[in-house]
């Protein structure tokens, strides 16, 4: 199990949202590059970045901050938020981002995501942003018509890096991990017969050391 710290970017600042709601943002660091350097200096092996403005339909605002972060640290970076086309994806790969996390596009344009995943072998994660058993898209504002298993089955033979699973109701709430949610979603992934090497990244609700202990007890890889 690996712990991956996250930086959520809004207006070129590090923020925390509650349940992914745009209007709830709280700034905790005005210097994203410094936050990224801090995570690297304390020994983190990878960094997770979410471009919230892009996710909410405001692209390009944080692009320069993302480039600065990439240039300032040597650890791998995975990036999500607002990647809605192959052009968007290639733009980030060109900056040196190691892995991309694709949500809405994986639902609405699966053929394009399949092409990207085959071109960039083992570099694409699909994002399952879940609320009340529904996959949410477009900045978590719309319900997808696809159910969880439907989406997983679309990609089960694709050379993905993995799945990023977010418990939206728990995200940013600092209430602790919902292990029942985790068990249910992981069970769905297993029943979809996806590649055994698929990586599962969990987000939403991880608050303290006890959450990590409880997660470890689930024996996830």
Question: Would you name each region that the model predicts?
Answer:
Residues 3, 54-70, 84-90, 104-125, ...:
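Active-site-adjacent beta->alpha loops and helix N-cap segments on the catalytic face
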Residues 3-9, 47-49, 77-81, 100-102, ...:
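Hydrophobic faces of well-ordered beta-strands that scaffold small-molecule active sites
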Residues 12-15, 19-23, 97-171:
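Conserved anion-binding
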Residues 13-60:
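N-terminal beta-alpha supersecondary unit
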Residues 28-40, 85-90, 143-154:
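Short, acidic/polar
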Residues 38-41, 68, 91, 115, ...:
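Well-formed, non-transmembrane alpha-helical positions, independent of function
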Residues 68, 146-201:
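Active-site/ligand-binding-proximal alpha/beta "capping" segment
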Residues 73, 77-99, 180-193, 199-221:
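Catalytic cores of alpha/beta
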